[in-house]
Amino acid sequence: MSYRKLGWDSSQRKAMLREMTTQLIINERIVTTEARAKEVRRTAEKMITLGKRGDLAARRKAAAFVRNEIADIHEEGDEVVVKSALQKLFSDVAPRYKDRNGGYTRIMKLAVPRKGDAAPMVVLELV
């Protein structure tokens, strides 16, 4: 199995990937280092593919990875509607890509490296 270690042990790396994937689903765009973006892209593409499937097994598999965070809060009449990241994945993000076979994300390099260690920075966003 090939993957980037990113300088962390497995539990820290998995937690970082879960968090960044969840933030990508919620915000649809994140700024990070190039190495992290390439790893997050892999997990995000898998989650969107699960969202496109939409069956119970896919929902459970995605729920095991995507963090239970609030993605959107809005009012409908007298009620306040709260949408989680998982709900946004299955109801908003995945249907957008129903006719697309992969390639749901885009990595664009930023001109200025990170101050401090000069790490190459990129923007990872949903297409």
Swiss-Prot record:
Which terms are listed as keywords in the entry?
A: Ribonucleoprotein, Ribosomal protein
The answer to whether the entry has keyword Oxidoreductase is: no
Record-level GO BP terms: translation
One Gene Ontology cellular component annotation?
Answer: cytosolic large ribosomal subunit
Q: Which GO terms describe its molecular function?
A: structural constituent of ribosome
Q: Which InterPro entries match?
A: Ribosomal_bL17, Ribosomal_bL17_CS, Ribosomal_bL17_sf
Q: Which domain of life is it from?
A: Bacteria
Q: Kindly give the SUPFAM superfamilies that the UniProt entry links to this protein.
A: Prokaryotic ribosomal protein L17 (SSF64263)
Q: Which family does it belong to?
A: Belongs to the bacterial ribosomal protein bL17 family.
* Subunit structure, as described in the record: Part of the 50S ribosomal subunit. Contacts protein L32.
Protein's recorded name: Large ribosomal subunit protein bL17
> What gene name is given for the protein in this entry?
rplQ
